[in-house]
Amino acid sequence: MSLLQISEPGQTPAPHQRRLAAGIDLGTTHSLVATVRSGQAEALSDSEGRYLLPSVVQYQVDNINVGWQAKQEAEKDPANTISSIKRMLGRSLNDITSRYPNLPYHFHDNDSGLPLIKTPAGIVDPIQVSADILKALAERAIQSLGGELDGVVVTVPAYFDDAQRQGTKEAARRAGLHVLRLLNEPTAAAIAYGLDSGKEGTIVVYDLGGGTFDISVLRLTKGVFEVLATGGDTALGGDDFDMMLADWIRERAGFGYQNDVILQRQLLDIASETKIALSDNDVADININGWKGEITRAEFELLIQPLVKRTLLSVRRALKDADVDVDEVLEVVMVGGSTRVPLVRQMVGDYFKREPLTSIDPDKVVAIGASIQADILVGNKPDSEMLLLDVIPLSLGLETMGGLVEKVIPRNTTIPVARAQEFTTFKDGQTAMSVHVVQGEREMVSDCRSLARFTLRGIPPMAAGGAHIRVTFQVDADGLLSVSAMEKSTGVEASVQVKPSYGLSDTEIANMIQSSMENAKEDLQARRLAEQKVEAARVLESLTAALQEDAHLLTEDEKTAIDNVVDTLIESVEGTDPVAIENAIKQLDKQTQEFAARRMDTSIRQALAGHSVDEI
């Protein structure tokens, strides 16, 4: 099939018509945001010229501090100042407390098993904390670029599982960001160095941050990166260098090992400054609490050499897992601020027998790679630089109740690809389901392109929501779409095949994407209204069935009260205010709670009738 250009309508070299996009490196210790301006990728700084934003959030009763200010408050308010939240994404409360037993946070006991943290601002989860960090970065980008962002690419570790990736996406959504794509951090670093358009082969990304070490082995084939193996150490980073040096200073200065939190903080701060100084100098002076001394780079390297060797053990394991020899590695990319330490670069270079890539600031390289990808995905590249891929040009999905579109495969997904989702029945006793396959970016079916329809029959009669139908979308290398629907308990199945691109010109694709962008706010409002109307219909149908069966459990006054609320709900459904419908549903739910309780009591009594205690 022909290659499809990832391009957006209205793209032009004119700066005032460029779409605004950003790449975000959501890190464990620090986060960054970058963009492409005048053809050059650059990290964006805050008003004080700082590029790094500490991944720290402090929650107060009427205020939320993010970044440097939050970090300064960490000592005074540790319980409400949350850091390293990335470690908690997609993990259960039990998992987190067993891995990190000394966390100062007040966790909220809950049946869900999720790590919910109690703060003066309310209960927050890791997704919300991540969202607050993303929001701060987005605000920095908006201020720097002078307009709202059309989309972002957010990076994640290559080893992140689906729950962690979905958590990252949800955090971006809560921050009000449109995620163009999640990009693996090592892939972003490789893109920053232009390796995606270079020679095919194996690339190693060595990422030594403040708190963690990650190693990734990638294979580049025809412009596509495949992750062959990942590894690392979640308890090893530049902070450990600081601790080794702080202990050295403590011993030399004769401070002893008393439990002095303030002194330990001072020692770590001095150690960090000294480490940075030794990256450019052979000797560094130390002055703390009246003690003066100096340390040579050679002495410092002797301290940290065992830690660097530990990283190389992880490298060896990852190469073994990938079944790759050291001699097969084409390039080694250095990521993370701790790779500035000369000994790290030297030992990594010696291990791979080649000079690692270090010309891009290792703190910024991931965000820069993400910004390059984001710029491509919103269509800012001129034709001569267009990324060519076999991709799905428009999202593929199906119609759900209320004329809504559920996107199954988003646009710009590389093919071949297969995705599946589960759906259920809307009505009691439903034995068939009509599957309407659509194409487009709008929220309502009426605004999208209809591709095919088929019907799944033979669904066992069940209560609404009881049946589980798995719908699978599969696009092969030739762009042929196969859609199948299967009822899981019986295995009954139906399917259809269609060519989504047939009869669709580039101009029509561009117009459909342009239309989705121009109508985004109205579409979301229409979707919310439709969703509330569907929920109202479900609630009313359920109540009607309940009243037909058990109306005798209500007094006349209670029936009248319920009828009045039902009338309010029906009236709101005829309107265009989703909030009014939502409030009416809540009011009806409150009005019928006692009725529901009586029905439950009656059902239990009927089930127990005629049975002795022993039988039960």
Swiss-Prot record:
SUPFAM superfamilies: Actin-like ATPase domain (SSF53067), Heat shock protein 70kD (HSP70), C-terminal subdomain (SSF100934), Heat shock protein 70kD (HSP70), peptide-binding domain (SSF100920). InterPro entries: ATPase_NBD (IPR043129), Heat_shock_70_CS (IPR018181), HscA_NBD (IPR042039), HSP70_C_sf (IPR029048), HSP70_peptide-bd_sf (IPR029047), Hsp_70_fam (IPR013126), ISC_FeS_clus_asmbl_HscA (IPR010236). This is Chaperone protein HscA. The gene is hscA. It comes from Proteus mirabilis (strain HI4320). The keyword Phosphoprotein does not apply. HAMAP family: HscA. GO terms for molecular function: ATP binding; ATP hydrolysis activity; ATP-dependent protein folding chaperone; unfolded protein binding. Keywords: ATP-binding, Chaperone, Nucleotide-binding. Belongs to the heat shock protein 70 family. NCBIfam families: HscA, PRK05183.1. Pfam families: HSP70 (PF00012). Gene3D superfamilies: 1.20.1270.10, 3.30.420.40, Actin, Chain A, domain 4 (3.90.640.10), Substrate Binding Domain Of DNAk, Chain A, domain 1 (2.60.34.10). The keyword Secreted does not apply. Chaperone involved in the maturation of iron-sulfur cluster-containing proteins. Has a low intrinsic ATPase activity which is markedly stimulated by HscB. Involved in the maturation of IscU. One of its GO terms (biological process) is iron-sulfur cluster assembly.
